[in-house]
Structure formats: C-alpha cells, structure tokens
C-alpha cells in the first residue's frame, strides 16, 4: 500500500507514528506491505477550516494522485463530522478519519486491523464475496438495502445497491428529508432504483433481471406508507420488465430460539444453548398469512442470540425458496466486519450511511464516490 498521505497536528507526531507502526504490524496478517505515507503537519488547535484547506491543497488542488488520506485527530476529534462530510460530499476523496483515543489504548492492533478492513473496502478491495447457486446466478439479481434513520428534525435515508454478480460492488445514494417534507420519503426508493439500474447497466452492459429489496426503518404498521412505496417501485420495475421482492427487516424481535441437547455423560440430562449460525425458522412462530422467516446468522457465545425477522411484503419472483439462503449468504460479506452480521451486507451498509446522513446532515455523495464504499 503506497502513495497515501497522513494529516496530523504537530503535538501528535509521536502518537501518529506509533499508529502507522501498528498499522504496518496489523497488515502482516493480510500479507500487505504498507509504505510510509507523506506526512503533512498542521499547527496545534487547527480549526476544521484549516484542516479542510490543507487537505484540499494536497488532495484536490495538488498534482500528486494520492490513493487515499488519513486524518489523525487528537483532542480535536469534534471536527470529525466536518472532515467526513467534506471528503464524502464536497471534493470527493477517499479518506479515513482516525480518532487518537480509539487507537492509543489496549487492543490497538485489533483496532488497526479493523481500520485496514475499512481502507481495503474503500479502495475497492474485496475481502469476501458470495458464491451463489447456478439457479440464483441466472436470475441476475441486484440486491438493494434501504434504511431510514430519524432525528427530531430530519430523516436520513440511505440506499445501497449491488452492481456485480458477487455482490461486492455498490452504487450508493443518501438523502435528507426534513420533518416538514417527510411525505417525500416514500418516493426516494423508486427514484434511486432507476439510478441503480442504470449503474448496473453501465457496468454489465445489461439491466438486472430481478431485484431483492431489503427495507429497514419501516414497520408493518405503516401500511399506507408501505403500499405507496411498493407501488412506486412496481411502476419502475414494470416498465423495465424486472421482477422484485420487497422484504421488511426487523432486528428488534422478541423471540429467542434455542437448541436442545442431551448430556450423555450425565444420564441424558437436557440442556439448551444458542443455535449454530444459519438457523432458519419458516413456521411455528411466523405469520401464516404472509411469507415470513427468521434467520440466526451469527453464533453467539455470551448471552442469548436474537434472530432477525424477514417479512416479504411483496414479491413476484417464481422461486421464493431461494430467498432465505440468498439472504443468509449476504450476511457473510459485509466488508466492515470479519465474520457474519445479523442482516445482509447491503442493509448493514445502508444502516451505517443513513445514521451518518441524519446525524451529520450529509449532502449528496460526490459523483466520484457514488460507487464503492467510501463512507465506511
């Protein structure tokens, strides 16, 4: 890994160099070699404007084509939102904002490993990819994750779509809906899907044959909203002859599932424990009037595992039996985590981006960053 740049304040030089050494050590596990960056020093107590001005000088106005930048923040980590927003939305360069208090503590190597995962994803590297069945491959599926995060004043909506057959390349968009305009929320997804279909076509020279939409941030009780959002999506897909599923994702379920075992060494005494990763529940506790299922994607060693509920609110694909396995496969390939997560990678990424959008009031992503995962 070379041709990168690191910004820091002069009083933090020793700490930032230790961080670089730890990053280099952590990279051994990935068989990477990290060359030393170009160091750019700022005065102590520099404002967010000073950081942005210096960053633009090197990354936007300069002649060097740096692959990415790290901003190392000491006690001034309150400027994190401004740096994140500027790099993602204004001038569109790939960056990693590092808070000193996160890396200067026990477990620094572990933190650096996670940072390397993020950097790898931001630069387009593939840590994991899904290998789907041939029958699924023929469907040319585009998976989409949509999440809404709410504050008292606004709603942040993020939409992430896969645009390759291993579900590891993405087209992204986020939007801010102010409280007084919240009725516009139901039209966001359909307009995004049109853009995502075009991005898929640009990359693959054809449009997807089917779309699976994972929707979080909306409940079954919001029937009017759901009906209108699905209607808008249906109109877009119908004009392009694309079949789709619209699946509500609920991680806040009250059910717990356990596996029963018999202890042969103790006269067959029964005991219960968390299920292995991949538990699928299709009946018994599901809604009989709808296609609904529960998946326990992770194996939990402490406490009790909470499954995720997937409720199919609409679908016109002819093979619904492939949906649970496809969903479980996507839980394995979230770029920002080593292992499985509770929800498919597209919805996990949308969850992260929607929270950032609502909290930091992000504008539209820079055109250069609408594909990829620069927001991680």
Feature-to-residue mapping (PLM):
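Long, low-complexity, intrinsically disordered terminal regions
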Residues: 1-376
């Amino acid at each position: 890994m070379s041709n990168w740049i690191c910004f820091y304040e002069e009083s933090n030089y020793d700490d930032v160099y230790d961080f670089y050494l730890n990053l280099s050590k952590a990279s051994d596990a990935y068989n990477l070699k990290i060359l030393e960056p170009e160091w750019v020093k700022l005065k102590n107590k520099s404002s967010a404007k000073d950081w942005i001005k210096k960053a633009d000088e090197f990354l936007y106005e300069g002649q060097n084509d740096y692959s990415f930048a790290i901003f190392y923040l000491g006690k001034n980590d309150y400027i994190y939102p401004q740096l994140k927003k500027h790099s993602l939305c204004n001038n569109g360069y790939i960056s990693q904002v590092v808070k000193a208090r996160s890396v200067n503590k026990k477990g620094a190597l572990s933190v650096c490993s996670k940072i390397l995962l993020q950097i790898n994803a931001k630069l387009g590297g593939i840590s994991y990819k899904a290998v789907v069945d041939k029958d699924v491959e023929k469907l040319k599926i585009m998976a989409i994750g949509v999440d809404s995060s709410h504050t008292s004043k606004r709603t942040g909506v993020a939409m992430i779509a896969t645009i390759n057959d291993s579900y590891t390349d993405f087209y992204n968009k986020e939007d801010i809906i102010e409280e007084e305009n919240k009725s516009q929320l139901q039209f966001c997804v359909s307009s995004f899907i049109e853009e995502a279909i075009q991005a898929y076509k640009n990359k693959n020279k054809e449009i997807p044959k089917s779309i699976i939409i994972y929707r979080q941030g909306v409940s079954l009780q919001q029937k009017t909203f759901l009906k209108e959002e699905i209607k808008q999506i249906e109109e877009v897909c119908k004009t392009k002859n694309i079949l789709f599923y619209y699946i509500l994702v609920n991680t806040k379920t009250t059910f717990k599932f356990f596996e029963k075992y018999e202890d042969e060494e103790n006269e067959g005494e029964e005991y219960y424990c968390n299920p292995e990763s991949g538990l699928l529940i299709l009946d018994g506790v599901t809604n009989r009037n709808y296609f609904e299922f529960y998946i326990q994607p992770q194996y939990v060693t402490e406490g009790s595992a909470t499954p995720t509920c997937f409720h199919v609110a609409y679908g016109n694909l002819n093979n619904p039996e492939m949906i649970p396995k496809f969903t479980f496969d996507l839980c394995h390939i979230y770029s920002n985590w080593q292992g499985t997560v509770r929800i498919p990678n597209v919805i996990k990424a949308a969850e992260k981006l929607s929270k950032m959008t609502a909290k930091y009031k992000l504008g539209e992503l820079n055109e250069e960053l609408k594909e990829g995962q620069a927001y991680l």
